[in-house]
From Swiss-Prot:
Protein name per its UniProtKB record: Peptidase T
Organism: Streptococcus suis (strain 05ZYH33)
BP GO terms, sorted: peptide catabolic process; proteolysis
Cofactor (UniProt): Zn(2+)
Family matches, as PROSITE patterns: ARGE_DAPE_CPG2_1 (PS00758), ARGE_DAPE_CPG2_2 (PS00759)
One Pfam family matching this protein: Peptidase_M20
Binding site for Zn(2+) 2: 142, 177, 381
Domain of life: Bacteria
Cystine connections: none
Cellular component GO terms, alphabetical: cytosol
Length: 406
């Protein structure tokens, strides 16, 4: 179905810089997110007719659409995140490509282009309306597509009261991209039977498996002496960091894994001969494999420390989120409903694991099962990001089908 306000709404959202900051200690991590919620989303939620619209200390803008059919007793939530990833988000200047013809798309005057040889999925979008960047910023489809789709669906229901639906709660939150947005999610305030994050990618994605995730910080304590007299005395902290990294499986890296394969990802290395540190993210799907990856890091450190008279490799691990499959599989109702709705709309459900995490990962373990549905974005987190308006329209169709499902 066509929704006249969807594109304009999306364009308003993406032009707002809501980049999150992993080094911040505030919630939300950036003031821009607060202003986006308070100055744009909350007034719009009230304008279109949502009830009990409020802004929580955890950074979530929340509202309710009461049921208009007493036989539809479920309470269903829809969640999307306001922040964008760690890439330039200032001065987003979207391009609208009408009736895409399959050729390369110049991204403004940046010198970059979306080329089918680099991004073969462009072949799926012949004849569609694409929204791209101008090559200097990301687009922000992740996850302002989701916000626009939820808002458009709610507006459509309010303007068409003959469409019967259950009670709906919507929540637009901060800091998903830095992994902390749902840490303070208020389950009691949201009060639904289950929810969906509208935070997936291409048409049909329906996801209830995520990585289990941990972070690791490894400190290396060296001993610096003059290199001219260093034999049997110098202990180079940088070399220890290199040795540690090389002891990890070479094939278990993001660029060499797919599907259900986990990985270690070296994110940062800094220091000197005297001291050095590295940070990693650890990802896997099965609990046994996830625990084994963390143990391997501890084992490597123990083996390296055996060469010294005092521990010089110190590993600090912290879990970040867990595979929500463990929760969702207890009651597959939200998956079955979404799957039926997609199939009734002629959309083939793509039920596959998320090689990442969503706010739903944490919210599911807090007590609200929250799988993930496509929002349309492709090549997210960078200058080559784009989204199809037709896919966004179908995401709105899916939301409308879910809330009317009997």
């Amino acid at each position: 179905m066509k929704y006249p306000t969807l594109l304009d709404r999306f364009l308003v959202y993406v032009k707002e810089n809501t980049r999150s900051d992993e080094n911040s200690t505030t919630t939300p991590s950036t003031q821009n997110q607060v202003e986006f919620a308070q100055n744009i989303l909350l007034p719009e939620m009230e304008r279109i007719g949502l009830q009990n619209v409020h802004y929580l200390p955890n950074g979530f803008a929340v509202g309710t659409l009461p049921a208009n059919d007493p036989s539809l007793t479920r309470k269903i939530g829809f969640i999307a995140h306001m922040d964008t990833a760690d890439f330039n988000a200032e001065g987003v200047n979207p391009q609208i490509i009408e009736n895409y013809d399959g050729n390369p798309i110049a991204l403004g005057t940046s010198g970059y282009e979306l080329h089918p040889k680099d991004f073969p999925q462009l072949a799926n979008y012949h004849g569609q309306i694409l929204i791209t960047t101008d090559g200097t910023t990301l687009l922000g489809s992740d996850d302002k597509s989701g916000i626009a789709e939820i808002m458009t669906a709610i507006e459509f229901l309010i303007q068409n009261p003959d469409i019967k639906h259950c009670e709906i709660r919507v929540g637009f939150g901060p800091d998903e991209e830095i992994g902390v947005g749902a840490d303070k999610f208020d389950v009691k305030d949201f009060d639904v039977d289950f929810a969906y994050t509208m935070d997936g990618g291409p048409l049909g994605e329906l996801q209830y498996e995520t990585f289990s995730a941990a972070g690791a910080k490894i400190d290396f304590l060296g001993r610096n002496v003059h290199p001219g007299s260093a034999k049997d005395q110098m202990i180079n902290a940088f070399q220890m960091a290199i040795d540690f990294h090389n002891a990890l499986p070479e094939t278990d890296r993001p660029e060499k894994t797919e599907g259900y394969e986990g990985f270690f990802h070296l994110m940062n290395m800094e220091g000197s001969v005297d001291t050095a540190s590295t940070t990693y993210i650890i990802r896997d799907f099965e609990e046994e494999d996830f625990q084994a990856r963390k143990q391997l890091m501890l084992d490597i450190a123990e083996k390296m420390n055996a060469n010294f008279d005092t521990p010089r490799v110190i590993v600090n691990l912290h879990d970040q989120y867990y595979n929500m499959k463990k929760i969702i599989e207890k009651d597959m109702t939200p998956i079955n409903i979404a799957k039926d709705v997609m199939e009734n709309l002629g959309i083939k459900p793509l039920i596959e694991p998320v090689r990442g995490g969503t706010d739903g990962s944490k919210i599911s373990f807090m007590g609200i099962p929250t799988p993930n549905i496509f929002a349309g974005g492709e090549n997210m987190h960078g200058r080559f990001e784009f989204v199809s308006l037709e896919t966004m329209e179908k995401a709105v169709d899916v939301i409308l089908g879910i809330v009317a499902y009997k």
